[in-house]
Amino acid sequence: MNKNRGFTPLAVVLMLSGSLALTGCDDKQAQQGGQQMPAVGVVTVKTEPLQITTELPGRTSAYRIAEVRPQVSGIILKRNFKEGSDIEAGVSLYQIDPATYQATYDSAKGDLAKAQAAANIAQLTVNRYQKLLGTQYISKQEYDQALADAQQANAAVTAAKAAVETARINLAYTKVTSPISGRIGKSNVTEGALVQNGQATALATVQQLDPIYVDVTQSSNDFLRLKQELANGTLKQENGKAKVSLITSDGIKFPQDGTLEFSDVTVDQTTGSITLRAIFPNPDHTLLPGMFVRARLEEGLNPNAILVPQQGVTRTPRGDATVLVVGADDKVETRPIVASQAIGDKWLVTEGLKAGDRVVISGLQKVRPGVQVKAQEVTADNNQQAASGAQPEQSKS
């Protein structure tokens, strides 16, 4: 006898009724759940004054550079400086053998004395003939000749004086001096070397390091944008000069601030960039020519800047920046923007947003354009939490 008993008709009816009731409840709950609006975190856009800075690569260069070359030929007798030391303008660096130049100077002085004596005699003759002019003892022709001889003698004195001065200058050039104050590098010649006037090789190089120049490059497009923003009043500079700060290659901020001096007049055709030159105090000679640095250029003050947290900005496959904005009807819409520059953890937005717009910065993955949402304002205290909790996805177009 089979001990398994079948289901009675009544039991089957009860089971079907219960199943239908449960299905109806699930559908109702699903419908109620679908009607709930997703919650998103938003920030309300506002304008604020912002100092706009740009970080550009650059290299240092000496304020002045003097290549020391001999102006007379001769043998180097002595070097009078320590390589790598700081020197003052006018100090003696090398001594060239002065013997021949001293002799030339002495000879020139002797020729001058002879010329002066001849000029004195010629003048005495003119004076004597002048008294006798008109008498039978001297003719007009003789007087004119004496006068011409005196003038020639005076000209010879002038030439002799010039020869003395030239000899004196050449003698002084045997003492090679520094034309500027600064730090002198290595010597390219030693004692006993023969040097020549106007030679191609410098004896040494002196560089003035305080102040010091920093040459940075900026794209011509950014340069034109900066000029346009300054012209139309979007950016404002104090005293018409932009301040510049430096970050050295080891990541340390240079203690002295500088100012932008000028921009080059031509654009590099290869790179499309333009050179800007800033000047910095360098009293301790911390900066040396040729060092790589990063210059932070204060472009100016934007009195009505709009900053948006970076987690609220997404990029299309083409690289265009967009944000999700909650409208007055609490519906989400996509808004294209121009994010020109990163400022900390925010984007500087120059186009596409205005004060009062509500930008979604958390819960982006839960919404799409046209969906009605429950917007919750994100404050500064929980903005970091929102940033870590919601990573923006790339918009697709």
From Swiss-Prot:
Highest taxon of the lineage: Bacteria
Coiled coil: 98-172
Compositionally biased intervals (Polar residues): 379-397
UniProt record, GO biological process: alkane transport; bile acid and bile salt transport; fatty acid transport; response to antibiotic; response to toxic substance; response to xenobiotic stimulus; xenobiotic detoxification by transmembrane export across the cell outer membrane; xenobiotic transport
Pfam family, one: CusB_dom_1
The keyword Coiled coil appears for this protein: yes
Membrane topology: Lipid-anchor
Species in which this protein is naturally found: Escherichia coli (strain K12)
Keywords: Antibiotic resistance, Cell inner membrane, Cell membrane, Coiled coil, Lipoprotein, Membrane, Palmitate, Signal, Transport
Record's signal peptide: 1-24
Oligomer and partners: Monomeric in solution. Homotrimeric; interacts independently with AcrB and TolC as well as AcrZ. Part of the AcrA-AcrB-TolC efflux pump. Complex assembly is independent of an efflux substrate and appears to be constitutive.
GO MF: alkane transmembrane transporter activity; bile acid transmembrane transporter activity; identical protein binding
The keyword Plastid appears for this protein: no
Region span, Disordered: 377-397
Listed name of the protein: Multidrug efflux pump subunit AcrA
Phenotypic effect of disruption: Cannot grow on efflux substrates novobiocin or fusidic acid.
Lipid attachment points (S-diacylglycerol cysteine): C25
Gene Ontology cellular component annotations, sorted alphabetically: efflux pump complex; outer membrane-bounded periplasmic space; periplasmic side of plasma membrane; plasma membrane
InterPro entries tied to this protein: CusB-like_dom_1, CusB_D23, MFP_Efflux, RND_pump_MFP
Family to which the UniProt record says this protein belongs: Belongs to the membrane fusion protein (MFP) (TC 8.A.1) family.
Chief location category: membrane
Lipidation (N-palmitoyl cysteine): C25
Positions of region (Required for growth on efflux drugs): 313-397
Function according to Swiss-Prot or TrEMBL: AcrA-AcrB-AcrZ-TolC is a drug efflux protein complex with broad substrate specificity that uses the proton motive force to export substrates. This subunit may act as an adapter protein that links AcrB and TolC stably together. It is elongated in shape, being long enough to span the periplasm.
Chain segments carrying region Interaction with AcrB: 172-397
Cellular localization per UniProt: Cell inner membrane
